[in-house]
């Protein structure tokens, strides 16, 4: 009887628990998957204000933090736990950069937008170690809400082992003051997100003034992910990367990162200014990019899968244009920073940012994409290189030594010119990078000498190397050349010559020295171009006596004790144009609507065109190929002889048996 009561009690208890178990199971089955909304941007390059540029739709006004703020506020009203991320290169590209060091306007305005995380891009190093450190110190001193600054692959251990340089120590102190970290964990509602920052290999190659050493990005991110796994309990791992993507997947740094660190759920990919209409996907890792200068914001929604990984369920590039209202408070802050530019930096040059230098009535200048990705002559490169030559030959104290060639690399060009007024601000924005030895923003012009033989190499650099390093596309005044893209690498140029002021052809003399004008950045980047060609295409800039230049800051062009800035050279050239409308304002000559034959493409696959006039590099390559073929033939013949000999021996053994 007692046993029967125990069984009955057990059945009753089970019956009581069953509804709860069923109810709990139903709740689990119906539980909503975790979700996260993310807004991303990168490569805004000091574009706090909206600006006029040339797009596929023509000349239009785009960008601006006040319009971004409107979009972000609307998103946060919908979901207060939206994650706001930036992929670096937040500075260098407009007049705002002239107050970068003292005001830290870019970082402070990222905070104004509610951005929670950013990383360093190569252009954050443009004002050298002291400039970066001062910016970080002043940002921290502002007391404002600022984004976390994350970089996981600075190799402090290696630098400490060698002994920190003064510049490295200055940056380290700035990092400490600001609170730079490898990663951070953010709570976004019920989602715990680990965010890592990383600085890429190509970014470092594009930062000639950077004194820091970096670990391999992939290895550093792997180590950081392992650290997060050991010490944190997170739902998602995101990487803000200033590494970029390329068409060639084998060289596409953030794709390499995604493949080698599969634990990453999302990579915000900066540096290459890529605009991805759809994410790149490798395994469970998504890569997103939204383009440059704040022309777009990226908006995406992610949903967690049953296995704990995430899907992007919504992805949109939101154009930032005049259809979006400006947030008044944000625009007021931007205007205050711009007023400081007028009364400070520009006053020293005798300009204001809205001052009209020239009017462009009808000329469609090439876009930035054209300069980098359409390998031919472009009128934007022509007008800028002409400006460099003009400014040097019309500067106070000009020594009478004419400029033979002026060079503009596509990597130095930051914007184009639209129709209508060309202002001081638009000219500065078009060639805004860097700082001189004087500590004043803007790369100065330098004057060097190259031999005729080296000028031919410069043409070959554009023809052969710039497809692999698009920032090395060269636009030149005074030097014309033709190339055939189908010819052997390092042997693509078929004709190269000088053009005098009357437009006459002048043949180059291999050993003669020619005066060449470029900006300081071009000189600093020569080593990267040499590395890209494995040392085969090497230029050695010289002084007028033919002595190699050891420090490009020694050959900066000075005027009245001040550096002649590249952007100011363009501004002066614009002002020099004739006033054809007779309204007191210069007009861009219609001649710039035409291509002049400075860089001609001979797209021929005719065998005679492919092999005619081979240069020494072609001969070297052919010789190497022939030697390799001879070695292979020799090895094959040797193997054949050995096989025959062994066959004979085996046959002899069989006969003897």
Q: What role is predicted for each listed range?
A:
Residues 5-15, 24, 620-624:
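Sec-dependent N-terminal signal peptides
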Residues 28-323, 387, 449, 466, ...:
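Acidic, metal/ion-coordinating pockets
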Residues 32-40, 46-61, 65-71, 77, ...:
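Catalytic centers of hydrolytic enzymes
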Residues 1-3:
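N-terminal secretory signal peptides that target proteins for export/translocation
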Residues 18-32:
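Sec-dependent signal peptide cleavage junction
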